[in-house]
Amino acid sequence: MSDSISTLAELKAASQTPTAARNRLTYLFDEGKFTELDAYAAAGDSLAGVITAFGYVEGNPVYAFSQDVTVRDGALTEAQAKKIAKVYDLAAKTGVPVVGIFDSYGADVSDGSKALNAYGELLMWTSNLSGVVPQIAVVAGTCAGCAAMLAESADFTVIAKDAELYVAPNANIKNSAENAAENGTAAVVCEDDKAAVEAAKNILTKLPQNNLSPVPMYEFADPTEAVGDDADGIAKAVCDGDSVTELNAEYGKASYTALATLGGATVGVVATNKTDDKLTAADCSKIARFVRTCDAYAIPVVTFVDTEGFKADDDTEAYGAVKDMAKLCHAYAEATTIKLAVVTGKAYGPAFIALAGKGSNADLSFALDTAVISALAPVTAVEFLQHDELKGATDLTAARNTLADKFAKENASAAVAAKNGCVDGIIAKNEIRQTLMDSIEVMAGKRISRLPKKHSNIQL
């Protein structure tokens, strides 16, 4: 397609030319139909390089923009920024979600400082709308420079396998989708741009229209799986059949976060012990971000706890992971949405307080009868409290384990935790689903007033 457009006929033809950018919008909207906005807006002798539109996704209104890499490599011009800003403005006025489809090599350098102002305005819009209407970013091609910051300002970022997401190119990392998944910048990696748009739709349908709307309700099927011991198995056995969408699977691999439905209503699911008994800094950051996103849209958070605590080796301490641990605690404590916890295995010390403790996290906390809840790991507690009994033992390891088992049964069982008021009830595996559904229903009217302040000063 020629970059130069001189007549109205050429303008109309150019605006309707089939492109990947236009096709991606047909993937997004119901029946591939949408109403285009500012179709003839131009930057000099060419179109603005972005298609902006509104339509319906699963029957609900959505605004979207899709960058067109065939026009000046999708470079952001002042004209393109104005089109995108209009989408954000309309979304703010109407309380409607925004989907941004990114495919651009960055700003148009010929615009000079105008491009900087344009990006600044768009970043202001995404910031102002954060937590007000859902924002989903789809990285379908190259997303470079300030555009990468714009995409990462969304609630969730989905990326195609062959796409790139970077602020500055790095030959060593290669700016790949795989890297974006591993460092947590992309929540989902898909085979191609069409699959990425479909994944964005799947996430979007689980979110409310805005922060004042209720979570969507759907007809649902009961789960077909028995409750297992792994994070994914528990989520799929408790939530509605085929409703679980895991997010950030490659980042913070000891933890599990997912959107799902429970009794037809959206819930956020957090689980530990996906691959490791202890949570890393990445796990803490991942869970904190997810909990804050759910809280922004009043999505109930269900946390399945089975962890020995936080990883605290020399490398972790040197990294300053305590900041991420504090961030996790802060995210749960600050959240006013419904918070439910089920201790399915081990829950020791700070991890119990952060994830399942009634003082800061859970409105209601339950435990399986096999749960072990303790301020210290039983082995550590025995070393500290019963050290004299270990003296002279022929087999020190066996003696320590015997005392630890006894300590767990007598001092750290679910029954002891219930007597001490640490959990609200002891349930069996086959009771988890119904208990959670009943709890969400009875807590639907939850209201909490916070102390007046500009914002909390969470560790970032």
Where are these regions (language model features)?
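Ligand-binding clefts of soluble mixed alpha/beta catalytic domains
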Residues: 1-460
